[in-house]
Amino acid sequence: MSSTDLPMLIGQSYTVAAVSPAGSLALLGTSSISVIGFSQSRRGIIFINSGTVTITLVPSNQTAVAGQGVVVLPQGQVSFLGNDSITFNCGWNGIAESGSGNPLQILELI
């Protein structure tokens, strides 16, 4: 069998744009605000407090009150990672302990 009788191999590559994690930023003050809305496709969510003030988070059907809910300490983070039977697709509200413009980074796992 000569080399011309062998099947030709073709190099293939396939690139898919990564959509996860999807990042966003919320700036919080001393009033409860929506930090992220509901997403049916969300498998998990990570909240990162890169600021110097404590931030409190609650599901969007509640009003955030400082210190009453999921507390994210300064330079800390909180992760909610789903599985086949648990998802974290609700919206979230947040509030800062004091001041304004306090950053909350959000990574959505889609």
Predicted segment positions?
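Short, intrinsically disordered N-terminal pre-domain segments
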Residues: 1-21, 107-110
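Intrinsic-disorder/low-complexity, polar/charged segments enriched in Ser/Thr/Lys/Arg/Asp/Glu/Gln
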Residues: 11, 42-44, 77-79
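Surface-exposed ligand/attachment interfaces on beta-rich extracellular proteins
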Residues: 14-40, 52, 65, 100
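Beta-sandwich interaction modules
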Residues: 36-37, 73-90
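Noncatalytic modules at the cell exterior or secretory-pathway interfaces
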Residues: 43-45, 84-102
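Short, surface-exposed beta-strand/strand-loop-strand elements in extracellular ectodomains
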Residues: 48-69
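Edge beta-strands of jelly-roll/beta-sandwich modules across compartments, strongly enriched
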Residues: 55, 99-110
